[in-house]
Amino acid sequence: TVKTKDRSLSAQYEHTIVVTDNGCEILTLRKDDTIPAIISHNE
């Protein structure tokens, strides 16, 4: 956990994802996690 410039708290998290010819699977997904059907990517 870190503090931002305005002193708010912030945290970073990551998931391990495997990509195959048939799609992808999130290996680190916990039972209480929800993942959106579409993940937005902004360049």
UniProtKB/Swiss-Prot annotation:
The enzyme's E.C. designation: 3.4.11.18
- Superkingdom, according to UniProt? Bacteria
Q: Name the Gene Ontology molecular function terms of this record.
A: initiator methionyl aminopeptidase activity; metal ion binding
Q: Which UniProt keywords apply?
A: Aminopeptidase, Hydrolase, Metal-binding, Protease
Q: Does the keyword Protease apply?
A: yes
Tell me the cofactors it needs.
Co(2+); Zn(2+); Mn(2+); Fe(2+)
Which reactions fall under this protein's catalytic activity?
Release of N-terminal amino acids, preferentially methionine, from peptides and arylamides
Relay the cofactor remark from the entry.
Binds 2 divalent metal cations per subunit. Has a high-affinity and a low affinity metal-binding site. The true nature of the physiological cofactor is under debate. The enzyme is active with cobalt, zinc, manganese or divalent iron ions. Most likely, methionine aminopeptidases function as mononuclear Fe(2+)-metalloproteases under physiological conditions, and the catalytically relevant metal-binding site has been assigned to the histidine-containing high-affinity site.
Q: Which Gene3D superfamilies match?
A: Creatinase/methionine aminopeptidase superfamily (3.90.230.10)
- Gene Ontology annotations of biological process type: proteolysis
Stored InterPro entries: Creatinase/aminopeptidase-like
User: Which family does this protein fall into?
Assistant: Belongs to the peptidase M24A family. Methionine aminopeptidase type 1 subfamily.
- What is the role of this chain? Removes the N-terminal methionine from nascent proteins. The N-terminal methionine is often cleaved when the second residue in the primary sequence is small and uncharged (Met-Ala-, Cys, Gly, Pro, Ser, Thr, or Val). Requires deformylation of the N(alpha)-formylated initiator methionine before it can be hydrolyzed.
Subunit structure as annotated in this protein's UniProt entry: Monomer.
What is the designated name of this protein? Methionine aminopeptidase
